[in-house]
Structure formats: C-alpha cells, structure tokens
Amino acid sequence: MVYENTDVAISQRKDFLTNNNIGICDIVASATRKKIDASDIGMEDVVLRDLISVLEKYPKVTTLLFTGGNSKNGPEYFFRRYLKQYGISLTNISSEVPRIHEVILPKSLRKIKTVSLIAPSGAANRAVGSLQKYKEMKLKYPSKTTIDFRVEQYKKHF
C-alpha cells in the first residue's frame, strides 16, 4: 500500500478494510481541544458514540481493537466509561499486553472481545520500552524497534 495522503492511498486503505471485513469506528463522536494536537489527553467536552447500538446493528462484529489503553481519554477508558451507562463492565480475559476483555451486549447477549493494543503514537514508546516482552525481543534482536514490537503485536489480531 502507498502510505501517503492521496486519493490512491485512501482508495487502497478502503479496499483493504472492505476485503478483510474490517470496520473502523471512533468511540469519540465529538470533542473540543484548546491545543490543536493528536493527543488523547487534550480532548475536552467529549461525546461518546453509541457503540452498543452499532454493535447490535452489526452482528458479524466479534472483536473491538482499541489502539490505546485505559489511560485517561484512551479508547479502553472511554469504552469502560460508556458501558457504565448500561450497568455493564468488561470481564478480564488476559492482563498481559495487549489486554483482552469481553463484554456481553445487553440486548442480544452476544459476547464481544476487546483487545487493547499499544497506541501507534510516538508517545507510547516509553510504555513499550518498559515492557518485559519488548526487552526480551530487544536482547534477541537488537536492531528491532518499538515499531517492530507493535507490528508483531498488531499482526496477531488482524
């Protein structure tokens, strides 16, 4: 794929997602920022998308991949906050990174798995660098980077 911000690149990404039955849906429907940047922490006045309705509408969805964790304004954090409206919570399946949980939808009683992948941002490099699995990879393959670690993590879930 071409990694540019062009019509060709966008078309390639759309085709990839469609061909692999992958949907994208941001949990944040709207937010404001005082400082224009990409950080999650900078979001204010956050309105969350009604993901329960989205999940009930699309019964083929079995897994949600969060690109970020449970830190303030991260996707898992917002999803947990959103679920409280329904009186439901995530059930822990694995505490290892990436953390895996499941939730049972209130209407259909269908199980949805959630996987909290490490964020792709440069700011997440400190967190990656502190992980034991990253340190083990680095000892075995010194030329590998935090991005390589994320790619390996992402591959298992895509």
Residue map of PLM features:
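Short, surface-exposed acidic-centric catalytic microdomains
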Residues: M1-M43
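Short secondary-structure capping micro-motifs at structural edges
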Residues: A9-K14, L48-E56
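Surface-exposed, flexible loop/turn segments at secondary-structure boundaries
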Residues: T32, K72, G122
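C-terminal capping/extension of enzyme domains
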Residues: I36-I52, Y77-F158
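Short, well-ordered beta-to-alpha junction loops that form the rim of enzyme active sites
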Residues: F66-K72, A119
